[in-house]
Amino acid sequence: INTRQYAPGKSICFVVTRPRYREVFAASFEDRIVHHYIALRLTPLFEEIFSERTFNCRKGKGQLYGVNMLKEDIRQCSNNYTEDCYIMKLDLKGFFMSIDKKLLAEMVDRFIVKYYKGEDIDDLRYLCRVVILHSPEKNCERHSPLSYWEKLDKNKSLFTNGEGKGVAIGNLFAQIFANFLLNTLDWFIENEGIEHHGRYVDDFYCIHKDKEKLLALVPKVRELLAKLGLRLNEKKFYFQHYSKGVEFTGSIVKPGRVYTCNRTITNFIAAIRRLNKANNERKVLHAVCSINSYLGLLRHTNEYAMRRKVLNMIEPHIYKEY
């Protein structure tokens, strides 16, 4: 780093299959140290400019925080569910794979020059540029069958989405810089007079009493995203009266109550079935840990009856033998 000869090492690349096929890169241990070096210096500065309505990869926030914020936004905007208001949910198409590396590197560099006061500012600027512009697909070891990549769209893989585009899903800096990039969008929505809004990665909602105001926001958002090299996923546009509810970060939020989406319940049931089939203590312990995790998640939703129903699927011999 001191001699400006640092180059990221070989990454591990694989494809996860659930809930959908997705390409992931894992950086080498040495590179992760560099990622944390960057994060430790920039995260406190990013927190000072981030909107309070950005929920992912931030201390004290997360999926549950976002769901609770959405629930409260609906309650406030509808005046305790007594007045009409509307929910609009938008999504970005191929967000991580669409990020323009050069544009992101320039934005981060300008930010560092303006806000960072440390003596190692030159090192930080250098490392950020190297890390952002790095193409891990050119030096990686694949740990999944090649047939898995055939199931990915061309714009879902760094190998095929085009030169100079995309950041590796799985790296710490990708999450941090993605938030930084979309911070522009968060404040734009706020400045357009939408008080009730929130974002988790590339999934964001807006709530307002005037549905025409919400619809008028869409082309403005589309225009802003185009300047960042991004675009909306037109197939995931959602617009409804608040009484219809909305799905957000794996939960379904309705007036005064929250439910878990079907996929989570299906996975919960699968964990119960693994427990029933377990034939040794290790497998039982693994299944029980998974079940406890789902119970911890479901306790934050209005799912008491569902929890009882699923737990009743545990076969009696499990209690007797273990």
Where are these regions (language model features)?
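Glycine/proline-rich, flexible active-site/cofactor-binding loop segments
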Residues: R22-R53, L146-K156
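Phosphate/oxyanion-binding active-site loops and adjacent basic polyanion-contact surfaces
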Residues: V34, Q63-G66, A174, A178
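A residue-level signal for conserved active-site and pocket-lining positions in enzyme catalytic cores
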Residues: I38, L70, A174, G250
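Active-site-proximal segment of RNA-dependent polymerases
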Residues: A39-D100
